[in-house]
Curated annotation (Swiss-Prot):
GO terms for molecular function: symporter activity. It comes from Corynebacterium glutamicum (strain ATCC 13032 / DSM 20300 / JCM 1318 / BCRC 11384 / CCUG 27702 / LMG 3730 / NBRC 12168 / NCIMB 10025 / NRRL B-2784 / 534). It is a multi-pass membrane protein. Keywords: Amino-acid transport, Cell membrane, Ion transport, Membrane, Sodium, Sodium transport, Stress response, Symport, Transmembrane, Transmembrane helix, Transport. Induction: Constitutively expressed. Induced upon hyperosmotic conditions, but the already high maximal uptake capacity is not further elevated, indicating that the amount of EctP is not changed. The chain crosses the membrane at residues 24-44, 62-82, 102-122, 156-176, 207-227, 240-260, 275-295, 329-349, 360-380, 417-437, 463-483, 489-509. NCBIfam families: bcct. The lineage of its organism: Bacteria, Bacillati, Actinomycetota, Actinomycetes, Mycobacteriales. This is Ectoine/glycine betaine/proline transporter EctP. The gene is ectP.
Length: 615
């Protein structure tokens, strides 16, 4: 895959400082992150209280908006998928995909939510089975377990990827179709026009960088907690702040090395290795655990997901059956995903050039969702089986005591080769977060520069370091409630970008409508009354419009256009038979514009054979 992308940058010369990054975008975004880190560490518990109050208000009053908004995006994307715009390519019309389907899937998955599945694979189903989301079933009953998996599939299935697919599709379209700079502001060019290069557009790019940094920082924070828990199980490493900060430092350092290597050498290699390792771990659980039960449940899982999704995607707990549950889980997930969706969207757009809109939507929504269902049906059901055979083994530490990061390693204790497999799982988690950080660093650099690989390596390394710094600061201020703090901050940061997504849908549809050519109406054979075998045979033997008697497509004349969009046919045109024209015939095409509605366009009704036209 070539790392050179044909992208037109904004019409600006070098800035006075000689920096490749835009000074406004760079200084505002980095300045905000630095001030946040310093203020968060300095204020400590006061910052924690402030985050909690703001996030609490958003969850209490606007949770319904997140639920309905994400479902609206899903419906919008399905409409685009089924429409004529589905055939449009993310790039020039003759571009081909740069990656095979398997490599494409590995990269978008590893750079997306792969690390999150490692964290929640066991923990989420057991949480929901114990504390039933709708509070209408007995804890750990069969019905409660089914509902638990329905919600888990909902959280990590199509809807999570819907949030990332919208900016990904929008970025891919405007960057590779319209050749605009690789910035989030480019998506809004049909609305803002030239202002994407001035303050309004740059503020959007600042929002994208800040959202990406905080979204990935939350993911890294959760991963660090899980890595620390795994090290505690294996080597009795203390679960304290200084150990977690050391883990962040090491992961960030390795991510800096990877990001300095670029997309092909670093991220692509790590992504492929990581997916292979994750699949190997999944097969280990499948074949060394209750294999038959897991296989049966794997099949059932797709039915559970399909039957529950229409209800869950619109459920907002209006009767307050389980107050606070949806804010803690569903709304947090949507806010978290929205927060880092510019990064995943830009990354997925970068690796999807040459694919059609329909391929993009279908692939980005279906492939990771299918893998997610398989993953949770195996890891989640394995955890449920461990709990059912030994009540309290998982629910007590994971749900009651809140030690969510250790859930996976607690299950691995019940499997053979515990030490080796747990260490193997740790490596997978670490690599997942390395790929997330270096992917985000590359994307942040593109948002800041408006081009790819136009800055020194130190810039991309700096972006990786900012992610580590934010994750570290959030864990420092409240080590005892690290997950809660991470959740609260991401809910606050995500809200502005959530509103931006509604505008993004309008802008994308407007841009596609402006760029796409009209689609011809379907044409069929014209039948006369068929009341004898001879007429049936005669009419059945006629070729369809545009095809010869042998079923081969007839050639189409190549149509050229002048600068005003008028069709230009060089040479003579031979027409056999009568020609009817509705409207006036003019010698000068410019006169046609003055004639207004009296000027008609004669549309070709079918392709003509070479014998029927001469150009």
């Amino acid at each position: 895959m070539s790392s050179n992308i044909a992208i037109t940058t904004e019409p600006e010369g070098k800035n006075k400082k000689g920096l490749k990054s835009d000074p406004f975008i760079f200084s505002i975004s980095v300045g905000f992150i630095v001030v946040f880190v310093i203020a968060t560490i300095a204020l400590g518990e006061k910052a924690r209280t402030t985050f909690s109050a703001i996030a609490g208000w958003l969850l209490e009053n606007l949770g319904w908006m997140y639920i309905g908004g994400v479902s609206l995006v899903f419906i919008f994307l399905m409409g685009i998928f089924a429409s004529r715009y589905g055939r449009v390519k993310l790039g020039d019309d003759d571009d081909d995909p740069e990656h095979t389907l398997i490599v494409w899937f590995c990269m978008l998955f590893a750079g997306g939510v792969g690390a999150v599945l490692m964290f929640w694979g066991v923990a989420e189903p057991i949480n929901h089975a114990f504390n039933v989301p709708m509070a209408n079933e007995e804890s750990m009953s069969e019905a409660a377990i089914v509902q638990a998996f329905a919600y888990t599939f909902y959280h990590f299935g199509i809807h999570m990827w819907v949030i990332m697919a919208l900016p990904g599709l929008s970025l891919g379209y405007f960057i590779y179709k319209r050749k605009l700079p690789p910035r989030l502001s480019s998506v809004f060019s049909p609305i803002l026009g030239k202002h994407i290069y001035s303050t309004p557009g740059k503020l959007i790019d600042v929002l994208a960088i800040v959202g990406t940094t905080f979204g990935i920082a939350v993911s890294v924070g959760l991963g660090v907690l899980q890595i620390n828990a795994g090290m505690n199980k294996l080597w009795s490493t203390p679960q304290v702040s200084w150990v977690q900060l050391l883990i962040i430092l090491i992961i960030t350092a390795v991510a800096c090395i990877s990001v300095a290597s670029g997309l092909d050498k670093g991220i692509k290699l790590l992504s492929n290795i990581n997916i292979a390792m994750a699949v190997a771990l999944m097969f280990f659980i499948l074949f060394t655990g209750p294999t038959l039960t897991l296989l049966r449940f794997l099949v059932e899982s797709f039915g559970i997901y399909a039957s529950w999704m229409p209800n869950l995607m619109f459920w907002t707990d209006s009767f307050q059956d389980n107050p606070g549950w949806q804010g803690k889980w569903t709304v947090f997930y949507w806010a978290w995903t929205i927060c880092w969706s510019p990064y995943v969207g830009m990354f997925v757009a970068r690796i999807s050039r040459g694919r059609t809109v329909r391929e993009f939507i279908g692939g980005v929504l279906a492939l990771p969702a299918i893998f997610g269902v398989v993953w949770f049906s195996i890891f989640g059901r394995a955890g449920i089986e461990v709990e059912l055979s030994n009540p309290g083994f998982l629910t007590q530490p994971t749900v009651v005591e809140g030690d969510v990061p250790a859930a996976l390693f607690n299950v691995l204790q019940e499997y053979p080769l515990t030490g080796i497999v747990s260490a193997f799982a740790l490596v997978i988690i670490v690599i997942f977060f390395i790929t997330s950080i270096d992917s985000a660093a590359l994307v942040n650099d593109m948002f800041a520069t408006g081009a790819e690989n136009q800055t020194p390596t130190s810039y991309r390394v700096m972006w990786a370091c900012t992610i580590g710094a934010v994750a570290g600061s959030l864990l420092i201020i409240s080590p005892s409630s690290g997950i809660a703090t991470l959740q609260e901050v991401v809910i606050i940061v995500a809200f502005p970008f959530f509103l931006v997504q509604f505008v993004m849908m309008f802008s994308l549809l407007k841009g596609m409508s402006e760029d796409a050519a009209a689609v011809r109406r379907v044409q069929t054979r014209q039948w006369e009354k068929t009341d004898t075998p001879e007429k049936l045979e005669e009419h059945s033997s006629q070729p369809a419009p545009g095809y010869d008697d042998e079923g081969n497509p007839l050639p189409m004349p190549a149509l050229e256009h002048d600068e005003d969009g008028n069709i230009v046919i060089p040479g003579n045109v031979v027409i056999e038979g009568d020609l009817g024209v509705v409207g006036d015939v003019v010698d000068d095409p410019e006169e046609a514009q003055e004639m207004g509605s009296r000027f008609k366009i004669v549309e070709q009704t079918r392709p003509q054979s070479r014998d029927e036209y001469d150009i």
